[in-house]
Amino acid sequence: ALTGRRPSVVYLHAAQCTGCSEALLRTTKPFR
């Protein structure tokens, strides 16, 4: 997944899917 080949694509995807990005952030750093 994180091959580091095209981070720009991942960044764009995250930007398009803000919800997914938030979910990932919550998974890594849950606001509890």
From Swiss-Prot:
Protein name per its UniProtKB record: Periplasmic [NiFe] hydrogenase small subunit
What SUPFAM superfamilies does the annotation carry?
HydA/Nqo6-like
Cofactor(s) needed? [3Fe-4S] cluster; [4Fe-4S] cluster
Which residues of the sequence carry a binding annotation for [4Fe-4S] cluster?
C17, C20
Tell me which EC number(s) this protein carries: 1.12.2.1
Cofactor, free-text remark:
Binds 1 [3Fe-4S] cluster. Binds 2 [4Fe-4S] clusters.
Q: Which GO terms describe its cellular component?
A: periplasmic space
What family is this? Answer: Belongs to the [NiFe]/[NiFeSe] hydrogenase small subunit family.
| Keywords linked to the UniProt accession | 3Fe-4S, 4Fe-4S, Iron, Iron-sulfur, Metal-binding, Oxidoreductase, Periplasm
Q: Which Gene3D superfamilies match?
A: NADH:ubiquinone oxidoreductase-like, 20kDa subunit
The places in or outside the cell where this protein is found are: Periplasm
Q: What quaternary structure, including any partners, is listed in this protein's UniProt entry?
A: Heterodimer of a large and a small subunit.
InterPro entries linked: NiFe_Hase_small_N_sf (IPR037024)
Q: What is catalyzed by this enzyme?
A: 2 Fe(III)-[cytochrome c3] + H2 = 2 Fe(II)-[cytochrome c3] + 2 H(+)
Q: Name one GO molecular function term.
A: 4 iron, 4 sulfur cluster binding
Q: Which cysteines are joined by disulfide bonds?
A: none
**Organism per entry:** Desulfovibrio multispirans
